[in-house]
Structures are given as structure tokens and as C-alpha cells.
A protein has these predicted regions:
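Short S/T/G/P-rich N-terminal loop/turn motif that feeds into the first structured element of a domain
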Residues: 1-73, 84-94
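Short arginine-rich
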Residues: 73-79
Length: 94
């Protein structure tokens, strides 16, 4: 398991469609393929143009496929709503 931070930049007015997919049965099934959804910590920018989430990832390749458009379930949604995304690996420090 790896802690990751994902930042998604959304197109203008796309937030509701993005969240509709992420909370749909299809979106949850796809997310469960790479992340423990019960441990996700989401946040939204005040203008709703950016979404970020701290994730506990168990399949990094599936996460990349979900975000980069190579997953056939998420690709149609991302084509409509996403401008860009960034992924950060989180490390604990003492």
C-alpha cells in the first residue's frame, strides 16, 4: 500500500459531472481496483475547478490507467471533465 496525493484540474462547470461519476456504482467499482475507498480523504477547491484526494493505493498501474484515459470506463468521463492531473507520492517523515 502506498499513500498518494492526486490533484485533478477540471474544466469549467465540470465538477458536478465529475463527482456524479466518482460517486456512481461504476466509478466506485473502478476506484476499488486501485484504492481503499474507505481511507480516501477528498477535498475540493472553492471554485470547484480542482479536486484533490489523499489515497491509499494498492495497484499503481490501475490508478494510472484510471487517470490517463487508458481505462475504457473512465476515459469518456475524463475526456469531458478533466484538464489535467498530477500524482504525488507521500512519504512519512519523523
Amino acid at each position: 500500500m502506498q499513500d498518494m496525493l492526486v490533484v485533478v484540474k477540471l474544466k469549467e462547470g465540470a465538477f458536478e459531472k465529475f463527482m456524479g461519476f466518482m460517486q456512481s456504482d461504476a466509478g466506485i467499482v473502478e476506484r476499488k481496483k486501485f484504492v481503499d475507498v474507505t481511507k480516501s480523504v477528498p477535498a475540493v477547491a472553492p471554485d470547484k475547478r480542482a479536486f484533490l484526494a489523499k489515497l491509499v493505493v494498492h495497484n499503481i498501474d490501475a490508478m494510472h490507467a484510471f487517470l490517463d484515459g487508458s481505462n475504457p470506463v473512465s476515459k469518456p468521463i475524463w475526456d469531458e471533465v478533466m484538464d489535467s492531473y498530477e500524482i504525488y507520492e507521500l512519504k512519512k517523515t519523523s
